């Protein structure tokens, strides 16, 4: 007799009432209210202002007004993701948020906590749900070290079954390697170019471009253009790409009223962690209160958890200096942020690249995995030692990381002195595979199409045709940064659409994902 799986309590409350509904075609980022920013571009624009709680309430209400089912659907997708990746439902992760993150945020970041409470009130959610949205990127890092925090006198009874399961996995090398591959896949995201100076950019100013890639399950929610205007005296305004309920960017592309642009790419295979301040709060405080690049680097390192470890890149457009033209020149900074090892570089004339690894050998070799299988190395760029490059795929062009590093270096050198936003758009839509020696839109290329890769390459967790790929592009230059704006494109950088229906026809092994996926049609550019 078949037993019906008990639906998680959170899903019974918040999931779409017709959970087992017949498959209908969704468009990634679509909203029932049609608040997508005009022109069918699928961006949802919201502006919030004032005191923390009030702007949070406004945030929640605006999302619900645009699409009453947005959070319901979002949590149902998250529940599916958690069950696929961890074998645990969303209620388990709500519990982790309440036990391990709520207290830290409430005590250390009271204004951010008030904003989260406001979002919950405006959207009729629980605070732990808003916290989960914002620590979503931190959870794979925390979970990899879960036993350290739950196998304690305080939590041993509550988490007894979980401790039993995790000890069994830890004692089984094959199970542990499989778990590591799944968690590492969640850490392999994004390509980034940031350049400045007369030797590199067309006008000597800053140019920045970033594309996100992920599984197409959680990617579909990263369509919010969020503008925050704090009350007077409480920092600077900012505009960012974000998600419903986000207090920070999550995909991490933002511009602030201090004339600073920021972005990042994750460090794949990163395995060091200490439960301190979550990245969502640290980077949000950078954005709101940071006035210089040095302040950003300092705030990121304060009580750093190693969660969502990234190569962060920031650009400061500098001062105009009045009519005499004297002022601070534009500069860019790269912060390769490990846990115990951090590499900070600045330049007034150079280029920084992001490809999910680091140039810092200490982080690559000491704080990143180097013991996974060769297949996992090709899949996530987090595998075996690669001929002197460290355990991150740094020199391995058969991996996503290695190919993108080589190709980004080639392309920025090719366009040296001519880099502008149009050139960066071209770079981020590149399909050249150095391993194959030809154009081939696949899991290795800068414009990532892992869903089209039968080899199960980079970013697909080693599984062929997994619905994973690049799904957006954002670009900015000094002029747009001064306007506190950027250009944004929703969908794969090259413009190739992704159709759920067509993918399922070709690859029915993914049909259980169909209900939770969305189409990414070809779209145009908008100014944020």
List each model region and its residues.
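Domain-length cofactor-binding catalytic modules of enzymes
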Residues: 350, 357-361
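N-terminal mature-domain region immediately after signal-peptide cleavage
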Residues: 23-33, 38-294, 301-307, 312-346, ...
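Arg/Lys-rich, intrinsically disordered low-complexity tails that mediate electrostatic binding
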Residues: 1-37
């Amino acid at each position: 007799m078949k037993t019906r799986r008990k639906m998680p309590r959170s899903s019974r409350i918040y999931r779409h009432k017709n959970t087992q509904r017949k498959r209908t075609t969704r468009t990634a980022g679509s909203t029932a209210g049609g608040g997508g920013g005009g022109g069918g571009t699928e961006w949802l624009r919201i502006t919030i202002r004032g005191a923390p709680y009030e702007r949070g309430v406004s945030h929640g209400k605006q999302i619900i007004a645009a699409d009453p089912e947005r959070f319901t659907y979002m949590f149902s997708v998250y529940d599916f993701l958690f069950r696929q990746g961890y074998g645990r439902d969303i209620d388990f992760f709500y519990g982790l948020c309440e036990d391990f993150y709520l207290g830290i945020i409430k005590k250390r970041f009271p204004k951010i906590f008030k904003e989260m409470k406001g979002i919950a009130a405006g959207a009729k959610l629980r605070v732990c749900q808003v916290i989960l949205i914002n620590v979503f990127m931190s959870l794979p890092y925390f979970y990899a070290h879960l036993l350290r925090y739950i196998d304690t006198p305080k939590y041993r009874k509550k988490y007894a079954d979980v401790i039993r399961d995790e000890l069994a996995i830890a004692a089984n090398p094959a199970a542990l390697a499989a778990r590591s591959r799944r968690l590492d896949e969640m850490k392999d995201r994004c390509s980034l170019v940031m350049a400045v100076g007369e030797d590199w950019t067309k006008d000597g100013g800053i140019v920045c471009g970033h594309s996100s890639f992920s599984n197409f399950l959680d990617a579909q929610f990263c369509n919010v253009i969020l503008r925050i205007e704090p009350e007077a005296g409480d920092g600077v305004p900012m505009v960012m790409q974000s998600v419903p309920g986000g207090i920070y960017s999550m995909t991490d592309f933002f511009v602030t009223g201090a004339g600073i642009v920021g972005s990042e790419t994750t460090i794949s295979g990163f395995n060091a962690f200490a439960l301190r301040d979550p990245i969502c709060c640290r980077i949000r405080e950078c954005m709101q209160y940071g006035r210089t690049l040095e302040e950003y680097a300092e705030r990121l390192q304060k009580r750093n958890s190693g969660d969502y470890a990234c190569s962060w890149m920031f650009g400061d457009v500098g001062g105009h200096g009045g009519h005499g033209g004297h002022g601070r020149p534009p500069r860019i900074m790269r912060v390769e942020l490990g846990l115990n090892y951090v590499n900070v570089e600045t330049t007034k004339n150079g280029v920084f690249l992001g490809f999910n690894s680091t140039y810092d050998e200490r982080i690559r070799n000491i704080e990143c995995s180097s013991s996974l299988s060769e297949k996992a190395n090709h899949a996530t760029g987090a595998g075996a030692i690669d001929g002197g490059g460290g355990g991150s795929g740094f020199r391995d062009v058969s991996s996503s990381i290695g190919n993108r590093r080589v190709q980004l270096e080639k392309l920025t050198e090719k366009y040296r002195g001519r880099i502008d936003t149009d050139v960066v758009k071209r770079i981020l839509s590149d399909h050249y595979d150095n391993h194959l020696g030809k154009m081939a839109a696949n899991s290795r290329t800068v414009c990532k199409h892992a869903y089209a890769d039968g080899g199960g390459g980079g970013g697909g967790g080693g599984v062929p045709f997994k619905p994973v790929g690049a799904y957006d592009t954002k670009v900015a230059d000094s002029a747009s940064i001064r306007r506190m704006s950027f250009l944004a494109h929703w969908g794969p950088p090259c413009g190739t659409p992704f159709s759920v229906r067509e993918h399922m026809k070709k690859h029915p092994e993914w049909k259980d994902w169909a209900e939770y996926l969305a189409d990414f049609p070809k779209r145009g550019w908008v100014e944020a």
